């Protein structure tokens, strides 16, 4: 279960960051309305922003074959035959459905319900500067989709290592032999210190 949770944590971090950056791009092209979900003048780059929004939303919802789907699939498999299986399944399905409804309604309002007036001056400056990190995150999402199995093996190894309490205790509590006085074991007596002399 920990391995699946770690995989989903990586996915959700990347996807939510991508979604926030895309929203920032959209808000920069909507004039004074910004990121408020209501009709506004048409966007300058509706096709590119629409595709980016669709990709981020699909990954957040968990549509295959994006990593959001794989992360939820791993969580569902990890919960099989365990206490609370029904709650896990219900939560994942409900969250996916609510996310789908919310993002679909927001997308319809932002991209279709537009004013005929177009914006010619962009108060937020050239929003295309934000495209560089957005493109980088799109590449990360694609890489997580193509190499999901190696990433899951990595998270599984991390989960196994975290669950190995013996090895963890050995590393943390292992005695390190130094001659420095502050590394000696505490014997219940506080060391006596003298205040520094003031010249």
Predicted regions and their residues:
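Cytoplasmic/organellar membrane-interface segments at the starts of transmembrane helices
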Residues: 29-51, 105-199
């Amino acid at each position: 279960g920990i391995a699946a949770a770690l995989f989903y944590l990586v996915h959700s971090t990347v996807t939510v960051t991508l979604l926030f950056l895309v929203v920032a791009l959209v808000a920069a092209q909507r004039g004074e309305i910004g990121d408020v979900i209501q009709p506004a003048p048409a966007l300058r780059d509706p096709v590119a922003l629409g595709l980016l929004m669709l990709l981020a939303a699909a990954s957040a919802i968990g549509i295959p074959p994006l990593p959001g789907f794989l992360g939820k699939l791993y969580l569902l498999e990890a919960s099989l035959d365990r206490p609370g299986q029904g709650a896990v399944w219900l939560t994942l399905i409900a969250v996916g459905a609510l996310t789908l409804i919310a993002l679909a309604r927001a997308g319809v309002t932002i991209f279709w319900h537009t004013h005929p007036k177009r914006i010619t001056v962009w108060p937020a400056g050239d929003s295309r500067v934000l495209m560089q990190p957005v493109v980088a995150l799109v590449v990360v999402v694609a890489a997580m989709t193509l190499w999901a199995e190696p990433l899951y093996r990595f998270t599984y190894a991390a989960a196994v290592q975290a669950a190995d309490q013996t090895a963890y205790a050995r590393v943390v509590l292992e005695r390190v032999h130094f001659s420095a006085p502050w590394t000696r074991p505490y014997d219940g007596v506080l060391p006596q210190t003298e205040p520094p002399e003031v010249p």
